[in-house]
Amino acid sequence: MDIYIHGYLICLLLFLFRSETACHPLGKRRCEMQAFRIWDVNQKIFYLRNNQLVAGYLQGPNTKLEEKIDVVPIEPHTMFLGIHGGKLCLACVKSGDEIKLKLEAVNITDLNQNREQDKRFAFIRFDNGPTTSFESAACPGWFLCTSLEADQPVGLTNMPTEALKVTKFYFQQD
């Protein structure tokens, strides 16, 4: 009888103190979207140019072009990433032998971690001191990156230590 009471207490505690960073397993509870600022370790910030996410140095009146990253946490370290109020989502897309980062017109709050077709939108966050890296959940080993050169597209790399790509970002809640 004691075991049943303990089981009920554990269930009650888990229900009362559920993680606020994870969505309901069935995807029925709407997740809270949060806005973050992101910039790489070379101080390049994200902005949209010709419907493509790029990283560069914005100064003066151009600082208004900065794109905030919209985040919907789905597990403690896994999240969906988007821009424009969560209406454009970052996706890891396989095309033949190539893996690319694309922006797709999808509402971030409609995504569901349990749907295989939504996995391309999920990224795993790795914090290392003050910096953060993002690995694609759909394409393990592929990381969000910027180029050393300014005003180049944000992309993905499977060589995160390559000198020509930057995979470490500062990621701060707005």
Swiss-Prot record:
The keyword Disulfide bond applies. InterPro entries: IL-1_CS, IL-1_fam, IL-1RA/IL-36, IL1/FGF. One of its GO terms (molecular function) is interleukin-1 receptor binding. Anti-inflammatory antagonist of interleukin-1 family of proinflammatory cytokines such as interleukin-1beta/IL1B and interleukin-1alpha/IL1A. Protects from immune dysregulation and uncontrolled systemic inflammation triggered by IL1 for a range of innate stimulatory agents such as pathogens. Disulfide bonds join 89-139. Residues 1-23 form the signal peptide. One of its GO terms (cellular component) is extracellular space. This is Interleukin-1 receptor antagonist protein. The keyword rRNA processing does not apply. It comes from the Eukaryota. Gene3D superfamilies: 2.80.10.50. Keywords: Disulfide bond, Glycoprotein, Secreted, Signal. Glycans are attached at residue 107. Transmembrane segments: none annotated. PROSITE patterns: INTERLEUKIN_1 (PS00253). It holds the Pfam family IL1. Belongs to the IL-1 family. Its main location: secreted. GO terms for biological process: immune response; inflammatory response; negative regulation of interleukin-1-mediated signaling pathway. It is found in: Secreted.
